[in-house]
């Protein structure tokens, strides 16, 4: 997705060789037009898969996930990082480690909103080691639903996330693949010297 690559180049900030900050359009301030286009692109890629639900994790996955849900005309469900006191019924849960924050959270989804007839597209902002997507896939399995695919806005291809997801039998679609953050510079897959 050219517009996304342009945004990453123009507004992304390389923190170190493993962390890319995209607060200006995705993780803090949200570029709504760009997220609309992201959602539409995921729709075009998965429109024939019978998607019934979009699943993400709070907070940064919500913007691209809700835009995808709008295009699919299905609900967007997000896993919560803490069980709210209002959640009285059963839950599906998984442990998820955040690469960026270096923390582990137990995320929960109410069993009221995810069931065995659901065909789920998991959406996330970043793919690093794949822990978030694998954890969300575990929640889908607990519900006896089907994960149709994983949609990633920015993939750090130099980390093992894609390989881990594909080893788990999951279809991965990344809209922007970063090959390297070396030398304080973003290099995209296909642009390596």
Swiss-Prot record:
GO annotations under biological process? Answer: purine ribonucleoside salvage; xanthine metabolic process; XMP salvage
Q: Name one GO molecular function term.
A: xanthine phosphoribosyltransferase activity
Enzyme Commission code: 2.4.2.22
Q: Which reaction does it catalyse?
A: XMP + diphosphate = xanthine + 5-phospho-alpha-D-ribose 1-diphosphate
What does the entry list as the binding residues for xanthine?
20, 27, 156
**Where does it reside?**
Cytoplasm
Signal peptide span per the entry?
A: none
The UniProt entry, under Pfam families, shows: Pribosyltran
Is Cytoplasm one of the keywords UniProt gives this record?
yes
Q: Which residues form a coiled coil?
A: none
Major place of residence: cytoplasm
Broadest EC class assigned to this enzyme = transferase
Pathway assigned in UniProt:
Purine metabolism; XMP biosynthesis via salvage pathway; XMP from xanthine: step 1/1
Question: What role does it play?
Answer: Converts the preformed base xanthine, a product of nucleic acid breakdown, to xanthosine 5'-monophosphate (XMP), so it can be reused for RNA or DNA synthesis.
Give the family from UniProt.
Answer: Belongs to the purine/pyrimidine phosphoribosyltransferase family. Xpt subfamily.
The protein's assembly and partners: Homodimer.
Q: What is this protein called?
A: Xanthine phosphoribosyltransferase
């Amino acid at each position: 997705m050219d517009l996304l690559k342009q945004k990453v180049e123009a507004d992304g900030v390389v923190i170190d060789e493993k962390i890319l900050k995209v607060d200006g359009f995705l993780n803090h301030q949200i570029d709504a037009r760009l997220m609309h286009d992201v959602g539409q692109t995921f729709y075009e890629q998965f429109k024939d898969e019978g998607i019934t639900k979009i699943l993400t994790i709070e907070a940064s996955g919500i913007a691209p996930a809700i835009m995808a849900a709008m295009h699919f005309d299905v609900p967007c469900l997000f896993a919560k990082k803490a069980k709210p006191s209002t959640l009285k019924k059963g839950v599906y849960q998984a442990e998820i480690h955040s690469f960026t924050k270096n923390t582990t959270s137990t995320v929960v989804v109410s069993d009221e909103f995810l069931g065995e007839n659901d065909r789920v597209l998991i959406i996330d902002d970043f793919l690093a080691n794949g822990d978030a997507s694998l954890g969300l896939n575990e929640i889908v399995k607990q519900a006896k639903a089907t994960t149709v695919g994983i949609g990633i806005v920015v993939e750090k291809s130099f980390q093992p996330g894609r390989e881990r997801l594909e080893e788990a039998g999951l279809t991965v679609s990344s809209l922007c693949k970063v090959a390297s953050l070396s030398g304080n510079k973003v290099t995209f897959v296909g642009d390596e010297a």
